[in-house]
């Protein structure tokens, strides 16, 4: 039992070589521009990871891999305390208190793997950010190179142009004439475009005027005719309607007027007609005497109305002259 306790005490007093080397790196004032203590002296900061990996790590370890160094810190319980910079801390890693370093022990495998995964994720994100910055810098360098090349080519182009002018003195006048000709052609093209536009507008205005003229003629031609007037009278007449029927150019005229009526004691419809007939002299129809001959033409006004439907009635036979003057009576 005593031997076991002494072994445990010896193990507790032994400081891990990694912790010793890390403390020496941080505590060395000559390397403060790469790695130094934090403001509260309970953490340390890696100022420039790239230079730190190339200059400091090979002097203390057998590698120059910053990711491996960070992974080792996580294994011994160090944590990153500032997301914007590489600052690490451990409760037993304090400035001027080396006796506390023996309390920093290596973590178990499970916890170490968990912390390692977290730190690996942070390292991957940092690497991606650095790669993005590198791509931006490379793109800027390419743009600067193109500008430099263009600037270098300008004197060469100017010298080549001057050489051509010396060899051919008429080069400048020809270039000026060509430029003037191109300008005139452009002006002519612009004028043609304006003319086409104006002609298009005029044609559209003429089409609109023609459409308005057609509408006016249609409205003029749709003026009510006598037949439409009679139809209007027929539709609005209180007694009935008059339907004109024309046969021949001149002749006798038969006017019939049928009035609508209803009987209060019957549901059947009745119709009554009042017929008046008058004849024109034969001379009007193209004859030569004062008497009245056969009827050459006839115009009839007929009106028939029934209650419950329309029944067309046959026109009455025209009585001979002179009875026609008395409308069928004396």
Swiss-Prot record:
Show the InterPro entries listed in the entry.
HSF_DNA-bd, WH-like_DNA-bd_sf, WH_DNA-bd_sf
Highest taxon of the lineage: Eukaryota
For the motif Nuclear localization signal, give the residue ranges: 191-195
PROSITE patterns per the UniProt record, alphabetical = HSF_DOMAIN (PS00434)
Hydrophobic repeat HR-A/B as annotated region, ranges? 114-166
Maturation and modification: Exhibits temperature-dependent phosphorylation.
Q: What is its main location?
A: nucleus
Q: Where is the composition biased (Low complexity)?
A: 220-229, 268-280
Q: What is known of its domains?
A: The hydrophobic-rich region (HR-A/B) corresponds to the oligomerization domain.
Which family would the database say this protein is a member of? Belongs to the HSF family. Class C subfamily.
Give the multimer and partner information. Homotrimer.
Q: What does this protein do?
A: Transcriptional regulator that specifically binds DNA sequence 5'-AGAAnnTTCT-3' known as heat shock promoter elements (HSE).
Name this protein carries in UniProt: Heat stress transcription factor C-1
Q: Which organism is it from?
A: Arabidopsis thaliana
């Amino acid at each position: 039992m005593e031997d076991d306790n002494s072994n445990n005490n010896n193990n507790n007093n032994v400081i891990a070589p990694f912790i010793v080397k890390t403390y020496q790196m941080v505590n060395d004032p000559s390397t403060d521009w790469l790695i130094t203590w934090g403001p509260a002296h309970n953490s340390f900061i890696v100022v420039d990871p790239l230079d730190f990996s190339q200059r400091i790590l090979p002097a203390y370890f057998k590698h120059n891999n910053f990711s491996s160094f960070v992974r080792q810190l996580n294994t011994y319980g160090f944590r990153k305390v500032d997301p914007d910079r590489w600052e690490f801390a451990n409760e037993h890693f304090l400035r001027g208190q080396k006796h506390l370093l023996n309390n920093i022990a290596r973590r178990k495998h499970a916890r170490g793997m968990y912390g390692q995964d977290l730190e690996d994720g942070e390292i991957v994100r940092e690497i991606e950010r650095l790669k993005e910055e590198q791509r931006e810098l490379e793109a800027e360098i390419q743009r600067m190179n193109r500008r430099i090349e263009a600037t270098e080519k300008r004197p060469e182009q100017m010298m080549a142009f001057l050489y051509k002018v010396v060899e051919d003195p008429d080069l400048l006048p020809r270039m000026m004439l060509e430029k003037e000709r191109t300008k005139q052609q452009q002006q002519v093209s612009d004028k043609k475009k304006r003319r086409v536009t104006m002609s298009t507008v005029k044609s559209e205005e003429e089409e609109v005027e023609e459409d308005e003229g057609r509408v006016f003629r249609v409205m003029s031609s749709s003026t009510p005719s006598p037949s439409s007037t009679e139809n209007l009278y027929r539709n609005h007449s209180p007694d009935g309607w008059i339907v004109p029927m024309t046969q021949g150019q001149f002749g006798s005229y038969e006017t019939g007027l049928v009035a609508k009526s209803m009987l209060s004691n019957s549901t059947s419809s009745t119709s009554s007609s009042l017929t008046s007939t008058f004849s024109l002299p034969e001379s009007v129809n193209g004859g030569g005497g004062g008497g009245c001959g056969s009827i050459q033409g006839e115009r009839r006004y007929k009106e028939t109305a029934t209650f419950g439907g329309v029944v067309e009635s046959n026109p009455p036979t025209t009585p001979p002259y002179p009875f026609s003057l008395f409308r069928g009576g004396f």
